[in-house]
């Protein structure tokens, strides 16, 4: 009975490992084939970019009115401390947003309400949205801060501008003067800015970091202390993924629930890695392998791999330093992929030169007696241990006189 249960558990582990291998390969293929539009990002789907949106000013100046670009230019943020009602005009100069003492309201009949739901400009606005219709206001917030995506202040072209294609390694102002008109009472206020192409860094140093970490994990996993090594690697992968996640949270204005949902894969990876570490610390390497594989898939493929474009883009959606963010992404990829391979190969990684390090059982030279726990030496097989003669004692082989 116990043998059948053990056999079933082995089959279950084998199935989990094979399934994990399929998921790992599929995730790598999808990640390598995904373009920027297909890549995942924390919060509201913002991905790394080489386009920087700048807000240059408000004309005329209005005390208490602040407008800034956030989410690496994907959204505009308006803070109204004027005590008056500020109306943001849409693409056809219709009332779109209204920010005042009573909160933030959105005109549900404005075409901008539909168009701004996506960062890609829609080909056609459906019926029901009419710039000439009487505004139908719906309150969306009780504060005096409005955040919205505005196509006028965001590069939404399907390709790079001609000037960028000619010299992509240099900075270029690709949109010199975007404008978003607003109304404050009877006054018209213009918020203006520009969009600049900023070339990104070379991704190869970060690729090298990931590859070196993969090699280091596999090499260290071949030692006699495989359980301890895998536990440390899993813990480091959780730490680097946590740094990446915290940076993305700090750089996104998305609501808490949205961010929790977007990072569910990372949270799952942390929990599963914790289970694997607990088993490894008890020396249960074989039972920890499926958990290591699943944790690596969640952390490396679902967490870090979709943000690989950040390695080669200048504008990174993170509240942390871009270099630290890129390092966290590359490290999570390297540690996670190395951990997945180590979990898949298991005993096949045991390198004799490393597994036989001094202090291990396999390092004992042949013929050397091993020391048991009680301090006594065991006799090597094939040899007889001779007891030393006592000084002055009679010899058994000596004939009696």
Residue ranges and their predicted role:
Residues 201-258:
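Core alpha-helical transmembrane segments of integral membrane proteins
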Residues 12-23, 206-211, 226-236, 264-268, ...:
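Alpha-helical transmembrane segments
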Residues 1-42, 399-400:
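Hydrophobic secretory-pathway targeting helix
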Residues 196-209, 323-328:
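Juxtamembrane/start-of-transmembrane alpha-helix segments at the extracytoplasmic/lumenal side
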Residues 23-35, 245, 279, 307, ...:
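Short hydrophobic alpha-helical membrane-anchoring segments
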Residues 35-199:
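Soluble extramembrane regions of membrane proteins in the secretory/endomembrane system
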Residues 247-401:
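Generic detector of multi-pass transmembrane helix bundles and their immediately adjacent loops
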């Amino acid at each position: 009975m116990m043998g059948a249960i053990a056999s079933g558990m082995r089959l279950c582990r084998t199935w989990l490992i094979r399934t994990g291998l399929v998921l790992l390969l599929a995730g790598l293929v999808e990640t390598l084939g995904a373009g920027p539009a297909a890549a995942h990002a924390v919060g509201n789907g913002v991905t790394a970019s080489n386009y920087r949106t700048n807000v240059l000013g408000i004309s005329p100046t209005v005390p208490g009115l602040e407008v800034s670009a956030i989410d690496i230019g994907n959204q505009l943020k308006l803070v109204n401390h004027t005590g008056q009602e500020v109306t943001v005009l849409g693409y056809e100069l219709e009332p779109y947003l209204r920010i005042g003492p009573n909160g933030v309201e959105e005109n549900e009949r404005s075409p901008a309400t539909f168009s701004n739901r996506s960062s890609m400009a829609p080909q056609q606005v459906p019926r029901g949205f009419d710039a000439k219709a009487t505004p139908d206001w719906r309150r969306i917030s009780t504060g005096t801060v409005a955040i919205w995506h505005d196509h006028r202040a965001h590069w939404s072209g399907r390709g790079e501008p001609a000037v960028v294609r000619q010299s992509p390694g240099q900075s270029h102002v690709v949109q010199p003067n975007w404008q978003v008109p607003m109304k404050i009472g009877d006054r018209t206020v213009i918020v203006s800015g520009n969009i600049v192409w900023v070339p990104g860094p070379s991704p190869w140093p970060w690729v090298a970091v990931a590859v070196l970490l993969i090699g280091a994990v596999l090499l260290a996993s071949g030692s006699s202390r495989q359980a301890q090594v895998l536990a440390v690697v899993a813990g480091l992968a959780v730490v680097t993924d946590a740094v990446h996640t915290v940076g993305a949270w700090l750089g996104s204005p998305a609501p808490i629930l949205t961010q929790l949902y977007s990072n569910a894969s990372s949270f799952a990876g942390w929990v599963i890695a914790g289970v694997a570490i607990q088993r490894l610390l008890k020396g249960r390497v074989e039972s920890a392998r499926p958990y290591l594989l699943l944790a690596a898939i969640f952390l490396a493929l679902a967490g870090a791999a979709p943000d690989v474009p950040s390695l080669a883009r200048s504008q990174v959606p993170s509240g942390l330093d871009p270099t630290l963010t890129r390092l966290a992404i590359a490290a999570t990829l390297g540690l996670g992929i190395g951990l997945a391979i180590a979990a898949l190969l298991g005993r096949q990684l045991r390198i004799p030169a490393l597994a036989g390090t001094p202090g291990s059982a396999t390092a004992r030279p042949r013929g050397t007696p091993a020391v048991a726990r009680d301090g006594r030496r065991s006799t090597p097989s094939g040899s007889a241990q001779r007891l030393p003669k006592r000084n002055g004692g009679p010899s058994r082989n000596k004939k009696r006189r």
